[in-house]
Amino acid sequence: MANTAQARKRARQAVVQNAHNSALRSRLRTAIKGVRKAVAAGDKTAAAAAFKTAQSTIDSIADKKIVHKNKAARAKSRLSAAIKAMAA
């Protein structure tokens, strides 16, 4: 239990920050799922469009350090590879 005023304030802030970070992580997963769904449907133009928006989302979330930059790079790389594999 937070006993000092400072600790109580940090506990309040942690609740708000956790909710915000969870929302951002959810947005990341949704963006990735959108690309995966377009790839599974075989729609290359939709997959490319979804990837473009997902790339921006992934980068912004990595910049905010919600996910590690290497995880973001890995996600973008795998999505890009999945789209390229559609053409082959």
Curated annotation (Swiss-Prot):
Highest rank taxon of the organism: Bacteria
Listed GO MF terms: small ribosomal subunit rRNA binding; structural constituent of ribosome
Biological process according to GO: translation
Pfam families: Ribosomal_S20p
Location of region: Disordered: 1-20
GO CC terms of this entry: cytosol; small ribosomal subunit
Keywords attached to this entry: Ribonucleoprotein, Ribosomal protein, RNA-binding, rRNA-binding
Annotated family: Belongs to the bacterial ribosomal protein bS20 family.
Protein function: Binds directly to 16S ribosomal RNA.
PANTHER family: 30S RIBOSOMAL PROTEIN S20, SMALL RIBOSOMAL SUBUNIT PROTEIN BS20C
NCBIfam families on file: S20
Protein name according to UniProt: Small ribosomal subunit protein bS20
Annotated organism of origin: Ralstonia pickettii (strain 12J)
